[in-house]
Amino acid sequence: ANFTGVIAKAVDAGYRLIIVLTGTVELLRSQTQRRLDMELVGRENILGGIDPRDGDLIADVDYAGSDDVDWLAGRFVSHGDLAAAGAPAIRRLTRAEDDYKLLRAGLDALDPRAGHELREPGKPVWHPDNIHRTDVRIAVVKKNKTVLTKLVRDLRRIKALLNEIPALIIDDEADQASVNTLNPKRATEDRSRTAINKLIAELLGHLDRGQYVGYTATPFANVFVSPEDAEDIFPRDFIISLSAPPEYRGGRAYHDFEELTAAERSDPAVSNERAFVRDLMASDDADPDEVDAELLRALDSFVLSGAIKLWRASVDPGLSGAFRHHTMLVHESVSQKAHADLALRIGRLWKRAGYGSPRANGRLRELFEGDFKAVTAARQWEPGLPRAGSFDDVAPFIGEVLDLVLNSNGDPVVVINGDKEQQYRKVDFQRERVWRILVGGTKLSRGFTLEGLTTTYFKRRAMQADSLMQMGRWFGYRPGYCDLVRLFMARGIKGRGRQVYDLYEAFGAIMKDEEDFRAQLEVFSQVQEDGAPAVRPIDVPPLVFQQLPWLRPTSRTKMYNAELDYCGVGGRLQDFPRQPERGDGSVNIKHFGLVRPWFEDRRFGAVEEFEYRDARTGRINSFRGRVAIISANEMRRVLGGFRWVEGFDFRPTLRMIDRAGAEGKLEDWAVLLPELSGSAEKIVDGIRIPMLKRTRRDGTRGGFSGSSFRQRDAIEAITGRRDAPGGGAARAYDTGRRGAMLLIFAADPKPGEERSPKLLPEEMTAADTATIFSLALPYA
């Protein structure tokens, strides 16, 4: 919808050639073509003057000739009389099922001069006397070498000079195929650019009046492009992070980014993991029967959630549209052979499940009472959402679920992997209801919208964060059924040696990385009074974060320009929990010794009350804590003494602190020591401190869990961030040149020993105490 709006504004501004680059498969291109035809091109331009009552001619018209549901329902935009409205006609150079083809003799379809559209042929196309009479050309094109070569070739053959045509190139999935993946240090001269990157660069080179706008959900690859490469596609002028509407279910909807107590972790009212995530622990190597049992539980969830949807629609008919589709995604491999085998396995399990029998109903009743009923009752998911009181309410709808799933050929499974084009017709969400189980890989992991996705069975490991993010198809809008979503996630995939991968943890890490990245992009979104960007990315390329050592932000081939010098975002709290393993406790002793003088010298003041906004309820709450003011030089010495896990580099942060100090933007630090209800006072080597519980992460990630959201607002308010509701006490510490540190101490005994502070002895040693901090630089 956003880039449809951008195109509409571009047309109003006089752009007359619109090229939309989609993903690399036809399925994605046709989806985008349809969306633009429906929202922008409109009925009149699609009909092209054909009388919709002329049955012979209308048969060849997209949508109208195929009795498309949305076309018949009037959902395609209508512009009325274009000439009377003074609006340009839109010529479609591509169709619903046809990518770009060489125009040959029909070049006037692309050429305003050959089409005799110019009022003043002696003046350029862009001249005001001509531009408003000129038709708009729009091509929705796959990022495919053959297709793009045809388009470039036709553009070079038209009569109009390319530098006189105002053009807009919209690149959807801009991190895919567009980025040059050949390292210039290694590539031979004749292969210095990848084919798609070269063709896009050639397009931009020909279209002097062309503008390039890229869209992507995973922008990591794009910011690794070299800013100095004049022909590459670096986002040099602006980067805008589009805010998701409240109804969108993103990473935070399914993960617990804040530290939770043991009781909170088991409560679906508080914990998103408890509400939505179901662990997959079995492997075919060790126990194939248990793998079948886990997969059967996922199938049961799919059937039961479908029955609940149908029951809700019977109670509230307004929900029927939201439940037109109901799908389950199964994703565990990129191999087409594996997809076929998995589809057969699911088919066998479906038959063995015996849906509709008393035995199956007994399983579904247990699942409803033990899972779905509790999760639905735990929160106010949506206003007025019908809630089934018992399994008996939804049981009568199970038969209808089976009819919908098996309505075509009796097979509940569809494989989508590019092997057979006819498979796609079985999931044509526009033409018919789709209640199916979808098995696939790349075709389902990038761009293709899975309507009604409710149950996900996910076991595929990827080594790049952007690839893994694209597989997260459960993010999106779930009207009327957000409480029914279930993610069956592999929690113990074996890697090389003793390496074990937790996919849920991996998704959580990249979602947190993305949040940090988006927070940084806010800097690049700001504009000056004249509309110019306050900061251009080409001047300060944005940083990409990486929490998991094994999960790179993007492919190595897209990262050859990556080199981090310094990093830091003013007014944003950043956690630094990546400390080494406890070992013999010597690192803990060293870290505690660095901050010990602050307590010995009684630098912390009296207890004060700070505020925060609870992200779950929106209410303003408070906590207590004490503050110490530490000079910039002393803090620099303390921070320089901390040790980190292998692979984590703290030096860019130190260089940013040095730079802020040298520029006079950082004079001192306010160190906030929270005193929370969950803490317990302990005496550590003679120093009395509040001790908290923090979870030690496993070896693949290292360090501790992050800070709580409860202290974030106060820290950011101290640094001068005006929209952080930290309370009057926090704002009183703001000087405009003050950084803030959140300092906590966590029990860190030997593995297997008690970690709960309230159960530990009053006197402890520094070896059993972790010193953990988070930082925020001055906002100004």
PLM segments and residue spans:
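C-terminal catalytic or substrate-handling cores of phosphate/nucleotide-
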Residues: 142, 283-320, 326, 333-337, ...
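Conserved C-terminal RecA-like helicase domain
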Residues: 45-123, 154-161, 165-186, 191, ...
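Conserved RecA-like ASCE P-loop NTPase motor core of nucleic-acid helicases/translocases
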Residues: 16-24, 326-333
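Conserved segment of the helicase C-terminal RecA-like domain
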Residues: 476-507
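Walker A/P-loop NTP-binding motif
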Residues: 2-15, 26, 35
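C-terminal accessory/interaction regions of large nucleic acid-associated machines
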Residues: 462-482, 612-780
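Conserved P-loop NTPase catalytic core
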Residues: 44-73, 77-85, 165-171, 175, ...
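A short beta-strand element within the Helicase C-terminal
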Residues: 436-439, 446-460, 485-486
